[in-house]
């Protein structure tokens, strides 16, 4: 981990300038190899150590969703930036939940609920975003899609862990002929 952040002077300066962030970092990377690997893959998350919401154990999911949609709306013509923003937002929230877990703020069940809620929000937001880009191909673009994303496995059981993948099935029930390919692209 230190090798990764030592390549960027800004990260070292941040840790030097904010000793409490360095202590939080030591707690996180000292607690599990998964946490250290996660930060190694996403060193930008060091900024989260300065966020006052880091240890807020009950995310306000409505505000989270609204803020994410507002930030996405600023990049409506830049799909790459939208995808980056979705990833960055997800990584930051996972890191917050990880820090809270390490601090003992969640039971296993409560943490699984929070991770599952996060996955639900990210899936719905992504689906909405993709539909906005594809709906012009539908015979009735003003109608909502007749499309469902079904989570099974750990997501379906609301038992997600930090390293869980998402097992998904996509279903559509649209009476319009020739929309199967559109829904396949949406999935």
Can you say where each PLM-predicted feature lies in the sequence?
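Non-catalytic regulatory/linker segments of enzymes
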Residues: 1-187
């Amino acid at each position: 981990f230190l090798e990764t952040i030592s390549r960027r002077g800004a990260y070292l300066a941040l840790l030097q300038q904010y000793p409490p962030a360095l202590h939080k970092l030591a707690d996180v990377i000292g607690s599990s190899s998964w946490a250290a690997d996660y930060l190694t893959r996403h060193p930008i998350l060091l900024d989260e150590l300065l966020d006052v919401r880091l240890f807020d154990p009950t995310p306000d999911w409505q505000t989270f969703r609204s803020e994410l949609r507002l930030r996405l709306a600023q990049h409506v013509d830049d799909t790459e930036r939208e995808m980056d923003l979705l990833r960055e937002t997800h990584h930051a929230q996972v890191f917050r939940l990880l820090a809270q877990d390490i601090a003992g703020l969640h039971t296993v069940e409560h943490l699984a609920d929070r991770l599952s809620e996060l996955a639900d929000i990210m899936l719905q937001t992504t689906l909405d975003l993709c539909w906005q880009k594809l709906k012009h191909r539908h015979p009735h673009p003003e109608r909502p899609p007749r499309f469902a994303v079904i989570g099974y496995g750990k997501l379906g059981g609301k038992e997600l862990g930090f390293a869980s993948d998402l097992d998904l099935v996509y279903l559509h029930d649209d009476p319009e002929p020739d929309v199967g390919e559109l829904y396949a692209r949406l999935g």
